[in-house]
Amino acid sequence: MITSDAIIWNAPNEPHPARAASQRSYSAVAKGDLEEWLTVYAEDAVIEDPVGPSMFDEEGKGHRGRDGISAFWKLAIEPIDTFEFTINDSFANPDGNTCANIGQIKTSFADGSHTTTDLIMVYVVNDDGRVASMKAYWEPARTMASFTQAPVA
């Protein structure tokens, strides 16, 4: 089990390029480090988070390339004060380029409100070990149902 202040890894952790890339991605997000996060992704990477049309991607086509991925960060990640990733299982394919992580992300905002998202994240890496595709399967309505308003002072 890997544990940091923001990442709890309860899943198998055999060496695997896609699994390692996913862990680097979680770490950069937890630190709020956009530049580090961008180094995890290939220049032409696509992020679909969540898969399909959503408040982050009305057409459901994903965020493509550096500009698209940076825009996704500003829209979906930057407003969050803290992240806690808990990965409960991870399935990796034998050829080493894909893994699917099953877990939960708890997010907190500066005002004290928070959400919990149960999800499956699928990472595909290129020959350089950088993420070429990341698809996160989760339901925005379920996340919003978990929203807890900050206490009123």
Regions found by a protein language model. Name each.
Residues 42, 109, 125-126:
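Short, acidic, Ser/Thr-enriched surface-loop or helix-capping motifs
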Residues 94-105:
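A short hydrophobic beta-strand element
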Residues 17, 36, 42-94:
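A solvent-exposed, acidic/Ser-Thr-rich amphipathic alpha-helical stretch
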Residues 84-86, 102, 115-121:
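Short, surface-exposed coil-to-beta transition loops
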Residues 2, 118-146:
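Short beta-strand edge/turn micro-motifs at domain boundaries
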Residues 1-39, 43, 151-153:
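Short, low-complexity N-terminal intrinsically disordered segments enriched in polar/charged residues
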Residues 25, 37, 45, 65, ...:
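Hydrophobic pocket/interface hotspot
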